[in-house]
Each structure stands twice: as C-alpha cells, then as structure tokens.
Design a protein with these regions (language model features):
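Short, surface-exposed "cap/lid" segments of acyl-processing enzymes
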Residues: 141-180
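C-terminal catalytic histidine-bearing segment of alpha/beta-hydrolase fold enzymes
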Residues: 1-4, 362, 369-433
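Glycine-rich nucleophile elbow surrounding the catalytic serine of serine-hydrolase chemistry
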Residues: 233-243
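Short beta-strand/loop motif that positions the catalytic acidic residue
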Residues: 354-355, 360-363, 367
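N-terminal cap/lid segment of alpha/beta-hydrolase-fold proteins
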Residues: 15-25, 76-149
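Catalytic nucleophile-loop/oxyanion-hole region of alpha/beta-hydrolase
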Residues: 167-178, 184, 189-227, 409-419
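Mobile cap/lid helix-loop segments that gate and shape the active-site cleft of serine hydrolases
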Residues: 254-280, 301, 306-349
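Short beta-strand immediately N-terminal to the catalytic nucleophile in serine-hydrolase-like folds
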Residues: 231-233, 299, 362
C-alpha cells in the first residue's frame, strides 16, 4: 500500500511538473534545462503508470519467476516491470482503459437512473440458487404479460469479469439488457458467478452448473419454458459457458465410447497423448444435472486460453489480467480449460448429441483484447464435431467493449455502434426461437 501511494504521488508530481517546465522553457536561460528535464519526466510518468497498474493488479499469485529472494522475503518485494518496452505497453493500455471509462460516463448515468427506478418498483425477483454450497443469488425478470403470458423463451445472461471485477461481476450491471429482453417477451435470468480472486475456474463452473440446474427445475414458475433455455456468455464468461458444456459433452462421449478405447492398441505417440489428455478431463460437480439447452450465445468470447494468454504476452498485459490465475496457472490446466483444446483432442470420439444444437458467436472485427480468430476457431471445431447450427455474426468495426456495451443495451456512443445496434439485436432475437 505504501509503495502504491509513493508511486502515485511521484507520478502525479511529474504530471504537474510538465506544464511548469514548458512554461519556464519560454525563458532563454532555463530553456536548455527544460529540454533535458522533459524526457525525464515523461519516463517517470510512463514507469509510474505501469508500476501503479502492477501494484494494484499483479501482486497476488504472481508467477514463480517473479519471486525475488527467499520465499520469506519475496512477498515484501513488489513485483514491477523494469523493461522500458513493457512499461510503455502497459501505460498505453492503462491510458486506453481510462479513456474508455471517461467515455462510459453516459452509460453509467443511464444505468444509475434505471437502477434507482427499479429499486423503488422492481420488475425482477431475487432468489438464492446455490444453497447449501454458497449464498449466490440470481435475478429473474419474468416476461412482459402484454407480450407473452406463459412458456416464454428463457435467456440466462452469465456475468463476465474485467477490472474492476466487483462492478463487472455484479448481476445488477446487466439490468438494462434484462429489462430490454423482458419487454420483448423473454424470461431473463442473471445469476451470481464467482470469479478470480474469489475462486478459480472449477468453482466458476460449479456455480454455472448450479444456476442452470435451478433454472431448469424452477423457471416454469416464472412463466419460462424449461424446454427453451438459452445461455449467453460475454467476454470471459463465454469461455466459462463453452467450457462447462464442452467439458460435460467430452466426458460423456468418452464414457459412451470407452469400450472402443479399451479395444484400441495405443501404439502411436499421438494416441498415447490423447489417452493421457482424456484421463485429465473431468466434469466439475457431476452430481449437478444440466437441463437440455436450446442454444448458446457467445459474445466477444475467448475459446483458447493458451492463444489468448500468448496474445496478452504480446500486449504486455499477461501479469495484469486474471486469465492465467483463473484458468491455470499451469500449462496443462490452461489446456484442459480451453474449449477448443477439448474439442480438438476428442473430436474423433465426440458425440455432438451431448451439446446444444445451436450456437451464435458474436464478435467485433477490431477486438484487440480477444481477436476474432478465437470465434472463427471455435466455429470451425464445433462444425467439425457435428454441431448442426453454428452462426458467426461479425461486426467489422467494433472493439471488445463496444460489443459488450451494445449487448448490454447501453446507449451507443459513436456511429459504429449505432450502425450495428439494430442488426445485432435482430440476429440475437432471430436466434432465440
């Protein structure tokens, strides 16, 4: 904490010193000194921004190579970067994130006004869904009575996680989209899901399985049709949704075709690797039964943890994000928690009957945090294993957060969003049938 305060104070002082140095540079005698001091201040600011980000986001569960000195002392030594290139990359990402936050103020006020209205006269009901395992809740938005009276299509929106996680994971953040879909006649469910640092991916999968199981058993009481349940993931929750479904389908396919594996001679090295991989696969909380799903919507989602982590390495943000610490940290854990790796390693024995028959993938062409190649790879593998309907809705000019904001039904902030808002909602509603 003291290190962070010191770095922030030093960075702030450098920011304040720049205009004074520029003003003093107008004096001929001080001009050479100001020319020399200006690059120094810029370097201090770049390092200060990068170190502040590391001190806030990168200290917990740091990688082994980041430990300095003996274990008893390393926890007291902050993990910060010294490479100028890495600091420049991190500072650039932080500045972009701050600019994104400033641009989102209009969306925040829109959400706050909606939240205050719903607080006084809520159109949803909050229910505990995970007792006795935890005290997670879910919000249920019954369909508008004027549109449909019973057996409405059910849409579960799974919250995503990005910094700050206490905001992005909050189910109330998804209220605008839930109310929008409710008015269109859908029964919407938004559950609490635990993410890092509260837990790692196995517990997140268990939370999702419990939520889906509760919806399948009780949604009829809220005018929903249990035979038409759709689940929607955004960002990192797309990885969670895809993993939960592919994991169960891969393990069930292995159980059904185990006799074939026993009769097959594992002579080749590739076959031995495949059998070892199959032994690592398991269903988290198999006693929790999933309902039959009508379809899956994955928006701006990752599907390959390894490739996404390597992409973060190129951006210089692999230590700041939660991906490795949530889905790993070891390489084999990242592999068995990647839906595309599960599909690729089990495609010869994969039975598509264990997966929903409809998938809709929504992705922005300018998404630099999760490249659109992740969606294209997942689409090709799902089609290869025999899933009947896999659609990819690509928005050429949208970035990662633009796609999420549009799906969350927040007001668009620029022309590109306006251009894609109606087609995206049409594609979503035509898929939810």
């Amino acid at each position: 904490c003291m290190s962070l305060i010191f770095v922030l104070a030093l960075t702030g002082a450098a920011f304040l010193a720049i205009p004074m140095i520029l003003a003093a540079g107008a004096i001929p005698v001080i001009f050479p000194v100001s020319i020399l001091l200006l690059p120094v201040l810029i370097i201090v600011i770049v390092y200060g921004i990068a170190w502040s980000a590391y001190l806030v986001l990168a200290q917990s569960d740091r990688p082994p190579y980041a430990m300095i000195g003996p274990p008893s002392l390393s926890k007291y030594i902050p993990f910060v970067p010294f490479s100028p290139l890495r600091c420049l990359k991190v500072a650039k990402i932080v500045c972009e994130f701050i600019w994104l936050g400033a641009r989102s103020m209009r969306s925040f006020w829109y959400w706050y006004s909606l939240y205050r209205t719903q607080k006084n006269s809520p159109e949803y009901e909050t229910v505990l869904y995970s007792l006795p395992f935890s005290h997670n809740c879910l919000d249920i938005y019954p369909p508008d009575v004027g549109v449909v009276s019973q057996n409405a299509i059910v849409l579960m929106i799974v919250p995503t996680s990005f910094f700050p996680s206490f905001i992005s994971c909050n189910r109330k953040l998804y209220m605008p989209m839930a109310l929008r879909m409710r008015k269109l006649g859908y029964c919407v469910v938004v559950p609490d899901i635990s993410y890092y640092p509260a837990c790692q991916i196995p517990q997140s999968v268990v939370d999702l399985r419990l939520a889906l199981s509760w919806v399948g058993a009780h949604i009829f009481s809220y005018k929903g049709d249990p035979s038409r349940i759709y689940v929607m993931g955004m960002g990192i929750s797309s990885e969670l949704v895809a993993l939960t479904l592919v994991q169960e389908a891969a393990v069930m396919s292995r159980v059904v075709r185990r006799q074939d594996d026993e009769n097959q001679d594992p002579s080749s090295e590739e076959e031995l690797d495949r059998l070892k991989f199959n032994k690592l696969m398991e269903i988290y909380a198999p006693q929790v039964r999933l309902p039959s799903l009508a379809g899956v919507v994955l928006a701006a989602g990752m599907s390959d943890v390894i490739k996404c982590y390597l992409h973060n390495v190129e951006m210089g943000t692999e230590h700041l994000g939660m991906l490795r610490r949530w889905a790993g940290p070891r390489q084999y854990q990242c592999i068995i928690h990647s839906p595309t790796h599960l599909l690729n390693n089990t495609k010869d024995k994969f039975d598509p009957a264990f997966l929903p028959s409809n998938f809709l993938l929504i992705h922005g062409g300018r998404d630099k945090f999760v490249p659109i190649s992740q969606a294209a790879l997942l689409q090709s593998l799902l089609m290869e294993v025999g899933v009947k309907n896999v659609e990819l809705f690509a928005c050429r000019d949208l970035g990662h957060y633009d796609t999420l904001k549009m799906l969350l039904a927040y007001p668009p902030t620029h022309s590109d969003s306006c251009r894609y808002d109606t087609p995206m909602m049409k594609a979503l509603c035509s898929f939810l049938v």
